[in-house]
């Protein structure tokens, strides 16, 4: 049996990097969505290794890459290089390094899946296994919540937050797995006994996506669905699979949405999760049976090409009718569209949850801090450096200085704002160029590929990208590698020139022998630099996390790890910030002051290091220097109430203590998100 499996892999060698990559994607998805450097950096090293192996194995194919696909790789590489260049002028260089490295990981993913020569069947296997793997991860997440003695730890303000820790990212993660599953469930090329499993997985994933009650996903997914129906082959089959998956979800939705109601009303969350799980199980069982029966029937039903073309036209017509009907119903529900849009705009500009949500978050107003995030990101940060930007992912510094809310986002909750504010017009143009070139490459596959299964893979890639780009326009999904990497990968598969029974001949880009040798040498050098760039911050972050969690048992060992972490990543102030915090809790003000001083030297705009230094100086009798540090902190973060309190109390005989500062910051986190899997300390 093992020999047979190895022989099967030898016949489809592209499955080897594909299976390793999707295993990485699923692991990232289950590891808080892969938004921290300790998660995405090792994934990037895996991708780098896969790219090196793929480039060697498919070296003859490198000269035959489709021109649009090659342009996409070059433009994305240029965007990554620009992001690294932005470190030079970024105020927080460690954050800019992380932002550039994250973009590097996405480049590696796109390159891996572009270089490999995919056959439609192999591509379908990879996409299908990803969806099934994600559904299996979802089963564990749901079972953990339903069986937990404290199920509320899986929620943030009544919304499902696992496995990413952020509700909106949970919705985007599972919807990302929905597209391949629902499409493959409609394909005749897929064995009939697997189509039911895929349809059940599709239904389960979209049901999981309801638990976070993400308003952005509810707004965006209709556009992605319409786009999917426009670009997918065999629209009748696709429409049937969609109708079944979404219909079963609609039947289970009231029980699923009740989790939020019970949680916000203070009810038994565990029972609510159990009821939701039962409803989802019944719905998915129905989908399993229906999908299997349809697959069996479809495998024995032969339709002429003219009938399929007619059915496709009917599918387009029905989609158009559904869109028009939806618009009519929507207009009837909202009344005057101008007044409705104005009301929603005023909601959006207002405070978060100013009017409450009632029994469902979908029915509440649109208030949030995003209007202020985007306003500062564009009118202050982008306007101050429109060409080059403030530096990759350097949004937080400028926002704290100019904000009108009490929120402290690290990212602007918008991919366009992130690009403009962080990388300026240059970086934004490079990234948009990549998207256009990648889309052209995928559309070529969609239009020219001889096999409907391959054209369907292109449709899945396009639909997933449309959903991701629309949703990430209003959220920080780019930061979650477990969400972004699959989207990039599917674009690479579909745009890289898949092979069929009659392979599409790509437009070659001839390269003379000296150029090839030079490119190989340059690629080897770049690979070494990339490995170092990813490995050192990753090891530094792991050592820092280890010190932060293990210092009560051995403080000296923790300090030693932090010293090493500081040396490995000379751009990051985090090791010193953690060292200072540990020293405060160990009642070692001298060590704390030294650590926070080093942190302030690495990040002069770090207000937390400044307030801690000011407080330590006041406690040590150095009033003049302490007050100066507090005023510098206020310049960096004028709206921070802790700084105002520290300055006011510095005038008397009872200055604010470092312990009080840390306690207040922890209380603030607990008041905003409550006790979750990541903030269990909030229960105490």
What are these model-derived regions, one by one?
Residues 1-85, 91-98, 102, 108-133, ...:
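Transmembrane signal-anchor hairpin modules in multi-pass inner-membrane enzymes, especially those
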Residues 26-36, 418-423, 457-487:
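Membrane helix-loop boundary segments at the extracytoplasmic
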Residues 84-90, 102, 135-178, 182, ...:
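Membrane-interfacial helix-loop-helix modules of multi-pass inner-membrane proteins that assemble, modify
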Residues 166, 354-410, 416, 423-430:
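TM-adjacent membrane-interface loops and short helices in multi-pass inner/ER membrane proteins
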Residues 425-459:
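Hydrophobic transmembrane alpha-helices and their immediate junctions
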